[in-house]
Amino acid sequence: MTARSTIDVSRLSTYAFGHRSLMWWATIGMIAIEGTVFAIAIVAYFYLRGLSDAWPPSGAPPDLLFGTINTVILLASGIPNHFAARAAESENLRSVRLWMVTCLVLGLAFQVVRALEFTTLNTHWTANAYGSIVFALLALHTTHLITDFIDTAVLTVLMFTGPLNGRRFVDVNENADYWWFVVAAWLPIYFTIYLVPRFFP
C-alpha cells in the first residue's frame, strides 16, 4: 500500500475575496436568479402594453421628479459602496465603518424618496393592468432595496461591535456586489416606467 501524499494547508487563509470565495459565487447565483425575475417583470410590462390601446390608460405617465431623484441617489450611492468594498479588501476597519455609514444614509434617503415616489405614479395598483405592473416593478425593486439596506445596517453594526474577523470584511465586500445589482436593476426599471410612456407612446 502506498502512502498518501498530503499538503499542509494550515497556513492558508480561512477566507477569500472575489471568485475565490464561495459566498461570491452564491451572491452571483442569487443576482442571476433575481435579475431574471426583474427581466420577466419588465417583459410583462411590455406584453401588457402591447395589449392596450392607450398606455398608460389614464394618459398621464408617472411624475418624473421622485423617480429621477432616486436615480441620482442610487448612482451616487455607488461611490461609498465602491470605497467600502475596497476598504474591506484591505481590511481597513476605520474606512469600512465610514463608507458603510455613508451607504446607510444614502439607502435611507432612497427609501424616503421611494415612499414619495409611490404617491406620484398617477395610478393605483388596483386601477388596471398598467397600475398593477407599475406597482409590481416598484415593489419588486423596493423589496430588494429594503433587504440590502437591512443587510448593510447589520454589517455596519457588526463593524462597530464585533466580532471582527477577515470573514466579516468579505461580507462587506459581497454586500457591495449585491448593492451594485440593486443599482443596475433600477436603471431599466426607471427607463420602463418613466421614459417609455413619454418618448415611446
Task: Give the role of each language-model region.
Residues M1-P201:
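...captures the hydrophobic TM-helix bundle architecture rather than a specific catalytic motif
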